[in-house]
Curated annotation (Swiss-Prot):
Catalytically driven reaction(s): Hydrolysis of (1->4)-beta-linkages between N-acetylmuramic acid and N-acetyl-D-glucosamine residues in a peptidoglycan and between N-acetyl-D-glucosamine residues in chitodextrins
This enzyme's EC code(s): 3.2.1.17
UniProt-annotated catalytic positions: 13, 22
Top EC class of this enzyme: hydrolase
Protein species of origin: Dictyostelium discoideum
Biological processes per GO annotation: cell wall macromolecule catabolic process; defense response to bacterium; killing of cells of another organism; peptidoglycan catabolic process
Protein name: Probable T4-type lysozyme 1
SUPFAM superfamilies attached to this UniProt entry: Lysozyme-like
Family: Belongs to the glycosyl hydrolase 24 family.
Length: 170
């Protein structure tokens, strides 16, 4: 059952302890942790080793792997970065501060996935969210590249915005 932002993100991101390429071709690991924007495998491994503080272990297929605790540490840092980036952005922080805790989770989820700058491109949706016009905001969000690229996840997040509940995560 999803009851926290951590649960929500783990549900949406999943957790993979081996390095993989995300839908954009970037090396990722753990709970949606983007290792680097460099698409070269060795550069990703070096960056990962720097982040975890030691030489990475390899699995039987010679793929880099991390432990659950390393995954959790990367996740905690990423979650902190997402939250701080919301709080430090004048536009988003104003909207975010006036939301209930459930809808705040939806905004954090979007920023975790796309980053603040991409979330800020949802100008009309954010205006409608600020005005607490939930159904209109949801309709606007459904008409987005984000919704077409990751429909399952985005529809869950949009439902959270629209209903103020976590029912989409049951």
């Amino acid at each position: 059952m999803v009851s926290s932002i951590k649960d929500m993100l783990k549900y949406d991101e999943g957790e993979k302890l081996e390095m993989y390429k995300d839908t954009e071709g970037y090396y990722t690991i753990g709970i949606g942790h983007l290792i680097t924007r460099i698409k070269e495998r060795n550069a990703a491994i070096l960056s990962l080793e720097e982040k975890i503080g030691h030489k990475v272990k390899m699995d039987s297929k010679n793929e880099p792997i991390i432990t659950s605790s390393e995954s959790e540490a990367l996740f905690e840092k990423d979650l902190s970065v997402a939250t701080k980036s919301i709080e430090s952005n004048p536009t988003l922080s104003t909207i975010y501060k006036n939301l209930d805790n459930i809808r705040k989770m939806a905004i954090i989820n979007m920023v975790f996935q796309m980053g603040v700058n991409n979330v800020l491109t949802f100008k009309m949706s954010l205006k409608l969210i600020e005005e607490k016009k939930w159904a209109e905001a949801a309709k606007e969000m459904k008409n987005s590249t984000w919704n077409h690229q990751t429909p399952n996840r985005s529809n869950r997040v949009i439902s959270v915005i629209e209903t103020g509940t976590l029912n989409a995560y049951k």
